[in-house]
């Protein structure tokens, strides 16, 4: 098995990438670095769920740096500009994951962000490719989005905590607005 450092945003989004990467001959080590997740209780809840799942699955977990001040200074000011905000957020988190991968002697690096249909897939991959190359790492980029329904099913079956927004306060507002819009559309369709 080839060791791979896999940045993880949460336990549910890790399920299918870990399974599929193992089938390809990789042995993922999970790397948690998510200073974007707010509020602090939400950050703790997601990390605790990931810790539990990794322990149950005998998966190594590295808890890396959490530079919240840097996130607030470099990402938060982009606020409502989702494409720029997400690109900056991916860059901050994946730069830390690549730093850890290089320091720990990994050749391969990837991210579970590629499982969610709500992420900016191409942007995330562009950022990962650039940062991995700068550190002499090989990015492992896979489109896990077709497996999102299975990840959802499995996470519910396992009783995992499932969040309903990406992590930052801006995504929480955007997700709430999307849910309200969908609810309104369903009500209108029933009339």
Annotate each predicted stretch with a short phrase.
Residues 1-191:
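Nucleotide-activated chemistry modules centered on ATP-dependent adenylation/adenylyltransferase
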């Amino acid at each position: 098995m080839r060791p791979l450092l896999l940045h993880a945003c949460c336990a549910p989004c890790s399920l299918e990438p870990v399974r599929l990467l193992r089938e390809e001959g990789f042995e993922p080590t999970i790397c948690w670095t998510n200073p974007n997740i707010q509020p602090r209780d939400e950050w703790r809840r997601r990390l605790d769920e990931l810790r539990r799942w990794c322990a149950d699955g005998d998966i190594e977990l590295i808890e890396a740096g959490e530079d919240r001040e840097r996130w607030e200074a470099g990402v938060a000011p982009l606020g409502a500009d989702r494409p720029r905000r997400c690109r900056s957020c991916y860059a901050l988190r994946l730069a830390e994951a690549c730093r850890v991968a290089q320091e720990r002697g990994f050749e391969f690096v990837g991210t579970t962000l590629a499982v969610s249909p709500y992420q900016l897939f191409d942007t995330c991959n562009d950022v990962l490719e650039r940062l991995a190359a700068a550190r002499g790492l090989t990015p492992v980029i896979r489109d896990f989005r077709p497996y999102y329904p299975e990840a959802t099913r499995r996470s519910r079956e396992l009783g995992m905590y499932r969040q309903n927004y990406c992590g930052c306060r801006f995504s929480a507002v955007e997700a709430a607005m999307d849910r309200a819009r969908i609810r309104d559309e369903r009500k209108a369709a029933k009339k």
